[in-house]
């Protein structure tokens, strides 16, 4: 891993460690409660999947629990931030018994080949410096015909929505996030990382190059989020 990648991951980890207690609240308020429906769309894809599952960049298990509501298989929740994982463990849920938290790097997964029947990553691919390596790792740990589900921010294609959305990210969301968490810089980074993230068409090409086959590629909420479902 080069120094630039190390520095980037250290920065992201520090920001997530700092905002952990208000992370879910800002996500819900900042998305006008659309995040609930986005997670539901992901979780439904796991309904008939074979376990065990892996939820990457899991944060405090917000998506993990939604997946387990649909399919109570063994689920490993991996995140770079120990603070996120510890906070997730404080959530009272009968589903905790199916969940196994693990601190780790999504670009270097500590699992054997062909371990998981399905893998999810919500709003985490954007934060990984080496996306090709990450996708290759996802492919490696999935079983044959295993399911990969990615939920990630994207930019609306329509200029009528694109520019107001950019203004909202830079000023509205950063103000809200800064007010509630005390770390405005974390949400300025969020706005910047969304702008820099490749469009869905480019991510699709990367997934196919690694060896995945498209099951579903869908724009949600006027294009501010994209849902990718691909099969090994």
Give the label of every model feature segment.
Residues 154-206, 216:
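C-terminal alpha-helical "lid/dimerization" subdomain adjacent to the S-adenosyl-L-methionine
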Residues 211-232:
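Core SAM-dependent methyltransferase catalytic element
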Residues 32-50, 66:
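Conserved alpha-helix/loop element of class I SAM-dependent methyltransferases that forms part
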Residues 132-147:
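A short glycine-rich, Lys/Arg-flanked "PGG" loop and its adjoining helix->strand segment in the class I
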Residues 107-118:
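A short acidic, Gly/Pro-enriched loop at the edge of an enzyme's catalytic core
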Residues 1-22, 169, 180:
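N-terminal, positively charged/glycine-rich alpha-helical extensions of SAM-dependent methyltransferases
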Residues 54-108:
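Class I SAM-dependent methyltransferase SAM/SAH-binding core
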Residues 117-130:
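A short SAM/SAH-binding and catalytic strip from SAM-dependent methyltransferases
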